Amino acid sequence: MKMMDANEIISFIQNSKKSTPVKVYIKGDLEGIDFGSSAKTFITGNAGVVFGEWQDIQAAIEANQDKIEDYVVENDRRNSAIPLLDLKGVKARIEPGAIIRDHVEIGDNAVIMMGAVINIGAVIGEGTMIDMNAVLGGRATVGKNCHIGAGAVLAGVIEPPSAKPVVIEDDVLIGANAVILEGVTVGKGAVVAAGAIVVEDVPPYTVVAGVPARVIKQIDEQTRAKTEIKQELRQL
């Protein structure tokens, strides 16, 4: 998987057409009303639903006030620069309530749980689970067969563009509510304890804990048993 360069992301955000999409439930004498070039209308008789940009739909509503009896607007963003990722073709399990922005790469058989937030440029490897309410900041990169625990934060780096992103290598387990700061690499097979704040690189096959996190031991058989990644949870 290719990590997006920070300057690519900055350019994308700068040049994107900012969007305020809305869904409008509307009723009245709607025949012949032009809701704008961005709009998609699903109207039967004197009622229906219109999808499109608020600027266009608002102008149509104001110009046809005498024809419109009532309307309700659903809106969840304003001048948004980055759309959400189209999930329909992703070969992964993605649960309701996950927020995943465009230009995120998700490997096959990954699992994204409810409430996870994944920012532009992040990369998630095959078979990796992102648990509930975890946050992957911009350009955060997670390898294969990892588990990022509930509420964990992998800090993002888009600004400044020279900053090094968080890198989580393969087979890593990050405990609940742990925080991995910018520029940190967590080595292959390592375990980060719940609640740890990691401010420096973690060697492969070690366990770190505490604030700030420190190596407390090498991975042993007991640790492997307690932190086993279950492939059964990743089957589609």
Swiss-Prot record:
One of its GO terms (molecular function) is tetrahydrodipicolinate N-acetyltransferase activity. Pathway: Amino-acid biosynthesis; L-lysine biosynthesis via DAP pathway; LL-2,6-diaminopimelate from (S)-tetrahydrodipicolinate (acetylase route): step 1/3. It comes from the Bacteria. Its EC number is 2.3.1.89. It catalyses: (S)-2,3,4,5-tetrahydrodipicolinate + acetyl-CoA + H2O = L-2-acetamido-6-oxoheptanedioate + CoA. Keywords: Acyltransferase, Amino-acid biosynthesis, Diaminopimelate biosynthesis, Lysine biosynthesis, Repeat, Transferase. It is an enzyme of class 2 (transferase). Pfam families: DapH_N (PF08503), Hexapep (PF00132), Hexapep_2 (PF14602). The keyword Cell cycle does not apply. Signal peptide: none annotated. InterPro entries: DapH (IPR019873), DapH_N (IPR013710), Hexapep (IPR001451), Hexapep_transf_CS (IPR018357), Trans_hexapeptide_repeat (IPR050179), Trimer_LpxA-like_sf (IPR011004). One of its GO terms (biological process) is diaminopimelate biosynthetic process. Belongs to the transferase hexapeptide repeat family. DapH subfamily. Catalyzes the transfer of an acetyl group from acetyl-CoA to tetrahydrodipicolinate. This is 2,3,4,5-tetrahydropyridine-2,6-dicarboxylate N-acetyltransferase. It comes from Geobacillus thermodenitrificans (strain NG80-2).
